[in-house]
Amino acid sequence: MANVTVIGAQWGDEGKGKIVDWLASRADAVVRFQGGHNAGHTLVVGEQVYKLSLLPSGIVTGTLSIIGNGVVLDPWALKAEIEKLTGQGVEINAENFAIADNCPLILPLHRDLDGLREQAAGAGKIGTTGRGIGPAYEDKVGRRAIRVCDLAHLDALDAQLDRLCAHHDALRAGFGQPPVDRAALIEELREIAPYVLQFAQPVWKRLNTVRKAGARILFEGAQGVLLDVDHGTYPFVTSSNTVSGTAASGSGLGPAQTGFVLGIVKAYTTRVGSGPFPTELEDETGQRLGERGHEFGTVTGRKRRCGWFDAVLVRQSCAISGVTGIALTKLDVLDGFEKVKICTGYRLRGKVLDYFPSHAADQAEVEPIYEEMDGWSGTTAGARSWADLPAQAIKYIQRVQELIETPVALVSTSPEREDTILVRDPFVD
């Protein structure tokens, strides 16, 4: 049975939630494999709108939903999100939801450190969500992390807390802050532990069991390839690997099981926070894209920066992540533009580049080379077949897939699950 891995092929916010929701309705299991509660997903099912930050999108449809070991978990944010969804009528229990017992925890001290660093950085800040994601990953790599399984052994946590607090106390002192209140931290963990542990298990084992039974598994990526800690616009990146290869290491299944890689691509480009953005439009056109696309973050509410489609960046993302096909989203936002542009290359100090350079100084200086196309006056909103699309919109889609050297598998024409043009079904072998 075919599996599917969904990743964002830009800077996140590509519309993954709707696509994952559509795929999740046909999957037997949905797995989050990286990131934390810093990446928002908005799902629209009928008249109901669900906003998720941590839980896999499959939870809304009752599909087995799993948080893998590659995620960093804020247990208090988890509880709040579950309570919000159950209030909307979503049933969540140990049968349809599981957390990897080796998943690292985000603690209050991580949120503290995140905020202190951003505040101290001033104009040079990265633009994190301030939710402790980065510091939690640092402690994981530094072998200081407290993990979900540790919640069952809080009385044996002294040595781990010694290492963790020694590290954070030194950092906090540098910011003029008092040491970590260990007693308060232990008490908070003791209170939340039973809630989290009811869902904890070796999820690699459960995934292996459902895989052997022929289940369709959907691996749900967060953010986007251009925010990958290795391949993104460093240092303006997230703290995890967002490429498709992480689906294996972040879930406990081998790379051969990750299946069809579906890259989610917005028909234009957006970015939240600081960092290079070659096609950014700081004019009326950029404002029009933002207003029509409702470009505000699900988690932070921050206004997104907007610009024309960058084929160079998306081609690079697709190559790095081994994308099999893309889902092109929010095409309807371009409806009514007399002309539309696509970035096909860059100029940098007299040279033409067909890739995005690695150094921050070069990234900041590249100038986009545009190809201009006629726009379309008709609407693409709600289209469910090629026959519903204006001819020029079809030409735009064809040009996008030519330039990114990756075929279009489906086109999304509204937030509604049914408003999708299917070219190739990712779940079909």
From Swiss-Prot:
Main location class: cytoplasm
Residues binding substrate: 298-304
Catalytic activity: IMP + L-aspartate + GTP = N(6)-(1,2-dicarboxyethyl)-AMP + GDP + phosphate + 2 H(+)
Entry function: Plays an important role in the de novo pathway of purine nucleotide biosynthesis. Catalyzes the first committed step in the biosynthesis of AMP from IMP.
Pfam family, one: Adenylsucc_synt
Family named by the database record: Belongs to the adenylosuccinate synthetase family.
Domain of life where this protein originates: Bacteria
SUPFAM superfamilies associated with the record: P-loop containing nucleoside triphosphate hydrolases (SSF52540)
Active site: 13 (proton acceptor), 41 (proton donor)
Subcellular location: Cytoplasm
Organism annotation: Novosphingobium aromaticivorans (strain ATCC 700278 / DSM 12444 / CCUG 56034 / CIP 105152 / NBRC 16084 / F199)
Binding site for GTP: 12-18, 40-42, 304, 330-332, 412-414
S-S bridge residues: none
Record keyword Nucleotide-binding present: yes
Note on cofactor: Binds 1 Mg(2+) ion per subunit.
One GO MF term attached to the UniProt entry: magnesium ion binding
Protein name: Adenylosuccinate synthetase
Cofactor(s) the protein needs: Mg(2+)
One GO term describing the cellular component: cytoplasm
GO biological process entries: 'de novo' AMP biosynthetic process; IMP metabolic process
